[in-house]
Amino acid sequence: MALGTTLRASLLLLGLLTEGLAQLAIPASVPRGFWALPENLTVVEGASVELRCGVSTPGSAVQWAKDGLLLGPDPRIPGFPRYRLEGDPARGEFHLHIEACDLSDDAEYECQVGRSEMGPELVSPRVILSILVPPKLLLLTPEAGTMVTWVAGQEYVVNCVSGDAKPAPDITILLSGQTISDISANVNEGSQQKLFTVEATARVTPRSSDNRQLLVCEASSPALEAPIKASFTVNVLFPPGPPVIEWPGLDEGHVRAGQSLELPCVARGGNPLATLQWLKNGQPVSTAWGTEHTQAVARSVLVMTVRPEDHGAQLSCEAHNSVSAGTQEHGITLQVTFPPSAIIILGSASQTENKNVTLSCVSKSSRPRVLLRWWLGWRQLLPMEETVMDGLHGGHISMSNLTFLARREDNGLTLTCEAFSEAFTKETFKKSLILNVKYPAQKLWIEGPPEGQKLRAGTRVRLVCLAIGGNPEPSLMWYKDSRTVTESRLPQESRRVHLGSVEKSGSTFSRELVLVTGPSDNQAKFTCKAGQLSASTQLAVQFPPTNVTILANASALRPGDALNLTCVSVSSNPPVNLSWDKEGERLEGVAAPPRRAPFKGSAAARSVLLQVSSRDHGQRVTCRAHSAELRETVSSFYRLNVLYRPEFLGEQVLVVTAVEQGEALLPVSVSANPAPEAFNWTFRGYRLSPAGGPRHRILSSGALHLWNVTRADDGLYQLHCQNSEGTAEARLRLDVHYAPTIRALQDPTEVNVGGSVDIVCTVDANPILPGMFNWERLGEDEEDQSLDDMEKISRGPTGRLRIHHAKLAQAGAYQCIVDNGVAPPARRLLRLVVRFAPQVEHPTPLTKVAAAGDSTSSATLHCRARGVPNIVFTWTKNGVPLDLQDPRYTEHTYHQGGVHSSLLTIANVSAAQDYALFTCTATNALGSDQTNIQLVSISRPDPPSGLKVVSLTPHSVGLEWKPGFDGGLPQRFCIRYEALGTPGFHYVDVVPPQATTFTLTGLQPSTRYRVWLLASNALGDSGLADKGTQLPITTPGLHQPSGEPEDQLPTEPPSGPSGLPLLPVLFALGGLLLLSNASCVGGVLWQRRLRRLAEGISEKTEAGSEEDRVRNEYEESQWTGERDTQSSTVSTTEAEPYYRSLRDFSPQLPPTQEEVSYSRGFTGEDEDMAFPGHLYDEVERTYPPSGAWGPLYDEVQMGPWDLHWPEDTYQDPRGIYDQVAGDLDTLEPDSLPFELRGHLV
């Protein structure tokens, strides 16, 4: 309320101030010259406002002033984008319109009229535009939107601060919807002039009813349509209500022992909800409870089974929470009713007839007390005395004493003591005994075999003792010759005697004695007794000897000693006959006269004399006692112990086989008594340690165990055995098998072509088997691996592969494989070198190499040949040996297996000195061969050859040809063709320029064509291919199948018919053909010009020079096909020339190169190569049909030393040709040097 009063007073003061200023500035009547005047206005920030100004003189200049600042007569009012003049100036309307007002617009305004012809200057009264700024936010402490925890009854301070506003807002604080009266507010200046902030402070004391309610701070202002609010939720902590125990039933605390009691305890209210626990006599018994937040209830249920000792126990439930001042409690005292836990009868219910029986009955503690009564059968007996005493747990104990006379007819009746009470009407408590009245038996007898009957030992006999009457039941005791019969506790005799228990049938009692008869039962007396009564019977038992014993006159025997053995049969019924045998062989003995023995039987004896040997050791001498009447024999044996020195048995192993790196066991089969004291092994004169070693151990049986056996362990082992009687010796052989190892292999093995040779492989192996040698030939083709034409020979440790009439195809790598059954097999590679005379590559009768003869270029001549052994190359020029000491000549020689190359590099080629015929001669020990190479000038190319059709469609034809000599410069190809019946030729350049296949497109179906081919380079055109012979072609019709051979190599995809209109396509193709023809014709004309220029230059040289003659002759030469097919280098049957240019040549082999300057020859360094690889793959392919030399280099396998060129000694051979004139990219004739624009010779 105080805050509202303060705010209203501030607003009233502001209103009075504004009203006074208005009254001061604006008179009561409208001044002259104005028909409308501005008024004081109040608007909310962000709204639009209009100050009216109507002038009676429309032509006057009008402007507004803001706090004395002139805004200018411009209606757009520059510098104030939100200001503008509204209205019709012609009517004198100059209203000031302000958009989106803000605090800067809060000022005094006046409308001013300038002097004019129509009237004097005028000024309107000043008016005030008041801008109301609403508060944007409220800052609440504690923070708005949170949950604030307070304790009920305590005072707390809440602060609420408004944001900037004009005028100062009115702040109200509410809790649970009720306005808080204890509040104070302070109005402070805002962040800008004319703005205010209000800070309100309230003191709040929450109640439990405020829990989960909102505390709201509201700020109201004339600038707000509705108050703004900020709030937080109050979490009020308060203690719970007292706990209440909900007792089931009306009698609180009364309960019966054994009852399952469930007591709920409920505490309502509280924040947090109450924590409950149960106590019994002050001790916690349950701390589990549950809560129901929707009903604000805490509940705990105590579950217990009531026992008698719980009588008088105090059960209480306690409730409290974190803000409780103390613990609230509700308690109940238990009153427990419980019956006696047991009834006990003291005294014995067994008595002799006609004597008194005295008993006492006592009940355990009960609440309330119980009464006792006695029953005998269905007859109630009266007690002599009854007593009541205090018991446990507040209960009582009852006791009753009884005395009565025992009679025989009452025997077996039930005597019962019963306890009862009105509190336990549904239960009966009693204790019962069986009355036992004692009296004696009347008769006793035995049932069993009749006396005098002969029973064989082992027979099962059943004796039954019977008696009539008697209580207690007669025990019926059995006796044997005055000794009590009992079952033996020894396991071996557990089945001999079985004594049954006393059994009753009516008034008759019986007890069974079952026994298996033995010698001790013979003539024995068996008696049964029951009290003073007894009965007896006697058995007659026949039995074999109870024991047969052998007595000896000596214990230690040696071969040749005499031994006397006596056999004694202790007792038998009837008497027995004795006999001797040794391991089944019957012996004669001497019998002694019979005599009396135990168990009323008879004894017998018989002796035998033996002479022993070592073979008798361990043998058994058996004495047999036989009863003819019983048909049974009892035997006993004596084992002979003969002392003798060690003797090796016949099954002793003499040879033991083992595998290297495996184990071996040298067994011992020896016989000795006593056992050998030591086993001593020796090997090659050295004794093996009995304690064992790194690779051997002597077993307890004397056997020798070896492991990690090596071939050095092979040999004879000697064993010495010794005991106290003497020594013995044996020899065993250990045969160690080991994997084969190739010891000798002649690598390489050399043979001349057509000769014979043996490839010898010698091994070290054990065992040596006849078929353990195998041979393999290493090659890529199965045909290369066949050994059918070779002979395999094996003799002992040496295997041979014999080759007859050696051929070049048999040269290469072979592998000797030896397998004697012990892994791993041995393998080793070797090389077969087939020596043959050199064979130089003869691609054509004459090879041309072009180079510029201006003494600035270099040329390289390549000569390649095959041959074994290594080849030495020599060069001649025009038949004269070439002087390689001349620095202008450099030769590089390369060797790779049987392929050899010589590169002759001529520096500063001179037309006068070097345009000549060079001859390369390859020589080895078996012969020589040579070839010629012509060094010529750079010239126009030779005509291509072999133009043929490889594919044909209605609109295209695939062509293929072989290029001619390019003249030492890059050459290109041009195709000329014409359609029969159509005038004019068509020219097509082949793309890419150096391709040798091309697809000619744009043809018409079912049309005959003629095709020509020519080549050109920077110096001119060649003649037409195949001496100008035309190639006739007829395209198939659209419905005819197209011919496309399997080996077609098209370079451009055929452009067949498509969905485009045919006429535009034909026009486009025609335009392309015209352009192509123009280019070809232009090229021909230009080449002719160059040729005329070259001919002019050549006229100044010697017309009859030898070089020019040779060149011209060679250019016109053709391959005649007269050479032998084995030396031909082409793969087809057509006779075509072969040319080699410097641009085409690049060594395909990077072999170990050697620069031959003075000495040449085979160094033999390659003999240590680890793997021969395809040593003579290229040699094996010397004679295939029409075989070319090209694949020769592709198939050569390089060794690891051949993968790079030595950088320190040799340059990359491909760099030799870097300066060849043919490598110049000068395709334009004008850019060609003058001396290269024609033939110099």
Curated annotation (Swiss-Prot):
Pathology noted in the entry: Nephrotic syndrome 1: A form of nephrotic syndrome, a renal disease clinically characterized by severe proteinuria, resulting in complications such as hypoalbuminemia, hyperlipidemia and edema. Kidney biopsies show non-specific histologic changes such as focal segmental glomerulosclerosis and diffuse mesangial proliferation. Some affected individuals have an inherited steroid-resistant form and progress to end-stage renal failure.
Known outcome of mutating residue 832 to P: In NPHS1; the mutant protein is retained in the endoplasmic reticulum
Domain Ig-like C2-type: 27-130, 143-234, 242-333, 340-434, 440-540, 544-635, 740-832, 838-939
One Gene Ontology biological process: myoblast fusion
Pfam families for this protein: C2-set_2 (PF08205), fn3 (PF00041), I-set (PF07679), Ig_3 (PF13927), V-set (PF07686)
Protein's name according to its UniProt entry: Nephrin
Region spans: Disordered: 1025-1057, 1099-1137
Self-association state and partner proteins as the record states: Interacts with CD2AP (via C-terminal domain). Interacts with MAGI1 (via PDZ 2 and 3 domains) forming a tripartite complex with IGSF5/JAM4. Interacts with DDN; the interaction is direct. Self-associates (via the Ig-like domains). Also interacts (via the Ig-like domains) with KIRREL1/NEPH1 and KIRREL2; the interaction with KIRREL1 is dependent on KIRREL1 glycosylation. Interacts with KIRREL3. Forms a complex with ACTN4, CASK, IQGAP1, MAGI2, SPTAN1 and SPTBN1. Interacts with NPHS2.
Compositionally biased spans, kind Basic and acidic residues: 1099-1114
Signal sequence, start to end: 1-22
Reported impact of residue 294 to I: In NPHS1; benign
Tissues where the protein occurs: Specifically expressed in podocytes of kidney glomeruli.
Effect of residue 851 to V: In NPHS1; uncertain significance
Localization terms from the record: Cell membrane
Residues carrying covalently attached carbohydrate according to the record: 40, 356, 401, 547, 553, 564, 577, 680, 708, 908
Transmembrane annotation, as ranges: 1056-1076
Domain Fibronectin type-III, chain residue ranges per copy: 943-1038
Family membership: Belongs to the immunoglobulin superfamily.
UniProt entry tagged with the keyword Endoplasmic reticulum: no
Outcome when changing residue 368 to S: In NPHS1; lack of protein expression on the cell surface
Residue ranges of coiled coil: none
Function: Seems to play a role in the development or function of the kidney glomerular filtration barrier. Regulates glomerular vascular permeability. May anchor the podocyte slit diaphragm to the actin cytoskeleton. Plays a role in skeletal muscle formation through regulation of myoblast fusion.
This protein's UniProt keywords: Cell adhesion, Cell membrane, Developmental protein, Disease variant, Disulfide bond, Glycoprotein, Immunoglobulin domain, Membrane, Myogenesis, Phosphoprotein, Repeat, Signal, Transmembrane, Transmembrane helix
Domain of life of the native organism: Eukaryota
GO MF entry, a single one: cell adhesion molecule binding
